[in-house]
């Protein structure tokens, strides 16, 4: 009887935890920070603008100009799952100093962008932003750069459009796979609101692909990149820079990262 009672308690706790995981998955995966509409971005050689997605949805974006006299093209940067452009804009210099203009934007519900984040809008907005950028640059001059969460959007856009190159920093096989790697006793992959199946899109990418990942990434495990890259062998070139001891947020500090970026953006 006692064993049965404890089993019932354990099952009840497990079910409650699963329900909590389902109900609060948005707060687990997304950590946006809003910005006041009059917030001023203070980045050099940058311009703030909005992209009107629908009559009531406006996406806030930043355009950075290269420090070189002539631009090599543009980098469309898809940022991670937290904060806003006030943080992510700091990463633009690694591209502008190497001769590229940069466009980055906040997802719905992040920064000054209005609306509610969901998977469909996340992917559709990425294509819309790419289309907007394509009016200013030929697609063969556009590099897509995905960072963590943003890797899914970058891969999806690259799978449907001709671009110069796809660069991924700490990518994932799918979002449920990432959560599963941390909580393997929970069936999150079957109940997740967010799927973002990057592994289904990567085989359709025909441009060069390069991946950066640290071996000590505590958010998106290193093996996510290994597993993702095994899904494709169709593209002209796919390479992986493994950063020994690299975590989720510190890859830019590695000389191997900087050397590879010099090569990729030459």
Q: Residue locations for each model-derived region?
A:
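Membrane-embedded segments
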Residues: 54-132, 152
């Amino acid at each position: 009887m006692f064993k049965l009672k404890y089993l019932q308690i354990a099952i009840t706790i497990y079910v409650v935890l699963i329900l909590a995981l389902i109900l609060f998955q948005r707060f687990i995966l997304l950590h946006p920070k809003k910005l006041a509409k009059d917030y001023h971005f203070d980045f050099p050689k940058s311009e703030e603008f909005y992209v009107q997605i629908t009559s009531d949805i406006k996406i806030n974006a930043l355009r950075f100009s290269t420090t070189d006299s002539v631009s090599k093209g543009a980098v469309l940067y898809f940022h991670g799952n937290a904060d806003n452009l006030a943080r992510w804009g700091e990463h633009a210099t690694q591209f502008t100093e190497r001769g590229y203009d940069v466009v980055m934007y906040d997802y719905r519900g992040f920064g000054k962008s209005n609306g509610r984040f969901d998977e469909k809008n996340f992917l559709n907005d990425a294509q819309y932003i790419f289309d907007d950028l394509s009016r200013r640059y030929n697609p063969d001059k556009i590099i897509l750069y995905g960072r963590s969460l943003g890797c899914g959007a970058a891969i999806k856009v690259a799978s449907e459009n001709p671009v110069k190159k796809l660069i991924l920093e700490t990518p994932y096989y799918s979002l449920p796979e990432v959560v599963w790697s941390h909580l393997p006793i929970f069936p999150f992959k079957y109940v997740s609101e967010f799927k973002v199946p990057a592994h289904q899109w990567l085989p359709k990418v025909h441009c060069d692909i390069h991946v950066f990942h640290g071996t000590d990434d505590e958010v998106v495990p290193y093996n996510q990149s290994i597993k993702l890259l095994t899904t494709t062998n169709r593209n002209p070139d796919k390479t992986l820079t493994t950063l020994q001891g690299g975590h989720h947020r510190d890859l830019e500090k590695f000389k191997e990262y900087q050397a590879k970026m010099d090569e990729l953006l030459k």
